[in-house]
UniProtKB/Swiss-Prot annotation:
The gene is rpmI. One of its GO terms (molecular function) is structural constituent of ribosome. It comes from the Bacteria. It comes from Chlorobium chlorochromatii (strain CaD3). This is Large ribosomal subunit protein bL35. The lineage of its organism: Bacteria, Pseudomonadati, Chlorobiota, Chlorobiia, Chlorobiales. HAMAP family: Ribosomal_bL35.
Length: 64
């Protein structure tokens, strides 16, 4: 049986930390920032961690 391929789109969007958690960037933080307040745009530039079932699914997609 051939090797499983990793999902290339998921590999570009998610990173695995050293402790094994999945890190992702927030959406809505790249353009049209003039209508969003400073607190919101600052928060949108921070990355966040995935939790629960979604993290398991993404981990399987990345590892292939």
């Amino acid at each position: 049986m051939p090797k499983m391929k990793s999902h290339r789109g998921a590999c570009k969007r998610f990173k695995v930390t050293a402790s094994g958690k999945i890190k992702r960037e927030r959406m809505n933080g790249s353009h049209n920032l003039e209508k969003k307040n400073r607190k919101r745009s600052r928060r949108l530039h921070q990355s966040t961690l995935l939790e629960g079932t979604k993290a398991k699914q993404i981990k399987q997609m990345i590892q292939g």
